[in-house]
Amino acid sequence: MIDENNLHGILKKVMIMKKKCALYASKLVKDGMVVGLGGGSTISYLIDYVKDKDIKVVSPSSKTVLLAQKMGLTVLNTQYVDHVDIAFDGCDEVDSHLNALKSGGIHTQEKIIASMADEYIVLVDESKFHETLTFKVPVVVEVLPKAYSVVKKKLEKLNGNVELRTASNKDGFLMSDEGNILLDVYFDGVQDIRLLNQTLLMMPGVVDTSLFVDILTGMILVNDKGVFKKERNGEFYAL
């Protein structure tokens, strides 16, 4: 039987930690900046902290766009932006080398924004940080529809357990905003993250993957002891 009081306490603790992480991230946002904002609850808290700043926002997340507009922020269409001062995002896992794994399915758009950003920082609590990625969530592979069968076969040859992502609110499979198929691929015992990502990207018909390798410039991590930042090739330091 679930202890509701204990569950409520855990959820409240997580919320407080996420708000603290967002608060420290907001201190990096200055007037005049173009800011990239991903998706998730921590980003929602960040929007609340920066809503009164003179900034412009780009986002791959429709929910984030709607919330930012509701809060009075100017949202730009990514199509017309070629530079972002700083971008923040969440992830399912991040490791000590700043490799990250996401499962939201909007990774191609997230990477476009990351490529424009001077800084691309993930905001996480300690449950998301691992010395190396665990791959407990799937690698999402975005595939051109006509390449579905051949890519699926190649993924299975790599010992990937492939699932066609389906829509929870309608019959049929789920497609990306660009009209491509999303495959959830579960891998066990990944030894070389970089090699896996390169192998996937080299498959004809693969648009991109939800593995973020050599993309993050930093992470802000919150735990019971405080808020810490880590930059590429650096150690954690307290904020």
Q: Where are the predicted features?
A:
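Conserved phosphate- and dinucleotide-binding cores of soluble alpha/beta proteins
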Residues: 2-9, 63-66, 71-239
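N-terminal active-site beta-alpha-beta segment that forms phosphate/nucleotide-binding
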Residues: 2, 6-89
